[in-house]
Amino acid sequence: MDHFKQLEVWFVIGSQHLYGPETLRQVKENAEKVVTGLNQQANLPVKLVLKPLVKTPDEILALCRDANYQDNCIGLLTWLHTFSPAKMWIGGLSILSKPLLQFHTQFNAEVPWDTMDMDFMNLNQTAHGGREFGFIGARMRQAHQVVVGHWQDKNAHARIGKWMRVAAAIQESKQLKVARFGDNMREVAVTEGDKVGAQIQFGYSVSAWGLGDLTAVVDAVSKGDINALVDEYEASYQLTDAVKLNGANRQNLLDAAQIELGMKRFLEQGGYHAFTTDFENLYGLKQLPGLAVQRLMQQGYGFGGEGDWKTAALLRIMKVMASGLSGGTSFMEDYTYNFQNGNDLVVGSHMLEVCPTIAKEQKPILDAQYLGIGGKADPARLIFSTPAGPSLNASVIDMGDRFRMLVNLVDTIEQPHPLPKLPVARAIWKAQPSLDVAAEAWILAGGAHHTVFSQALDLEHMRLYAEMQNIELLVIDNETRLHEFKDALRWNEVYYKLCSR
């Protein structure tokens, strides 16, 4: 998935006519060098495009209006090279609907002690020009991010890159369509929620489809297409004897391929990039979609089990955010615990639907085995473990008056023992700061049993996302202390009731 190829971030320099044409010429020349240098050397995921210098309120308003209407523009990066009186920005910022990053930098890294004169001081005023811009952002309660550092500094590059990834994810969220095949698992609470409220908050829409609509597309898949996809399976995975040619469950594999092709065509035809299924709504399907869901997630689709549309949307959004990074991102569920003094572990999995982007094995096992849930034929699935490394679990829940995101940092470990009788993909981790604290905090905060598990993204990505979406964020990591966490829950309740808008 390369979601960033056609996207742009507009690099905007603010100044004013006060300084005269020569100073403005130098500002433009320096800006061109900075943008060229960042595009060539900073390893940014999205291309920077230098826009004409803005010097008046009308120019700023026109630029912000253009940014709103350009689909490939995902945000503005501003640099106050000189002093740009911030009242000029009120009109533009009032209508800006794209993410905004203020890059508090300057062209020169060091002060030229021997040669610095007032001309130099006039030209290089970021130190106070940036503060003026920051004031109007704060005064307008304008949600924006700030990166401070020289434009050739690698730490600044990394932070800008993360902001770009999240800005691209925000753009995806605004246009995302989620398809629900069937309904939510009956009597489950956390997978419910306000879909209208979610569309207002995040931008994505959620549409329900009956199983008959899906099965009509599945049934229309040709045998030739099924056989071609099975050939791909045989080249990509280790097939068990049961699903090899003439194996006892070979037909189950063919049925799984048909479901995958039908689901993908349905999603493509409707412009959907995330979807849900429910084992209680399988009318017309021969098996619970397992392999199909795994492979569609690998191709970038978001997914949520049991009708969990919030997790499906979050998975798609995080996959866009993580595009091109090492490590995978998957639908996940805390399934069972290993309570052992000094070695408390969580086994994460699901009935079938874990994304192969987090697989340790180059060729996962492909099998079809019994699954009592759903009451259908033995479903095909990929079986694998997950490599060790820093990871996170994220969940978005509907609190009635707001959306809350929880993030728990975890340390994934190599599978400590064989699991010869467990026919599903899995990840095994140590929760931060400990299993008892992490689980208690998660439960107190109402975190869902479904999560998005990622070894590609880190906490800063998720903080930025929560800030840009203006939603509550609760973090559980090695710094978490339960009494402080409980205090934060109480304070947040008051804050969001007083400050909701």
From Swiss-Prot:
Binds 1 Mn(2+) ion per subunit. Keywords: Arabinose catabolism, Carbohydrate metabolism, Isomerase, Manganese, Metal-binding. Homohexamer. Catalyzes the conversion of L-arabinose to L-ribulose. Its EC number is 5.3.1.4. Pathway: Carbohydrate degradation; L-arabinose degradation via L-ribulose; D-xylulose 5-phosphate from L-arabinose (bacterial route): step 1/3. SUPFAM superfamilies: FucI/AraA C-terminal domain-like (SSF50443), FucI/AraA N-terminal and middle domains (SSF53743). Mn(2+) binds at E306, E333, H350, H450. It catalyses: beta-L-arabinopyranose = L-ribulose. It is an enzyme of class 5 (isomerase). The lineage of its organism: Bacteria, Pseudomonadati, Pseudomonadota, Gammaproteobacteria, Enterobacterales. InterPro entries: Ara_Isoase_C, AraA_central, AraA_N, AraA_N_sf, Fuc/Ara_isomerase_C, Fucose_isomerase_N/cen_sf, Lara_isomerase. This is L-arabinose isomerase. GO terms for biological process: L-arabinose catabolic process to xylulose 5-phosphate. One of its GO terms (molecular function) is manganese ion binding. Belongs to the arabinose isomerase family. GO terms for cellular component: cytosol. It comes from Pectobacterium carotovorum subsp. carotovorum (strain PC1). Its cofactor is Mn(2+).
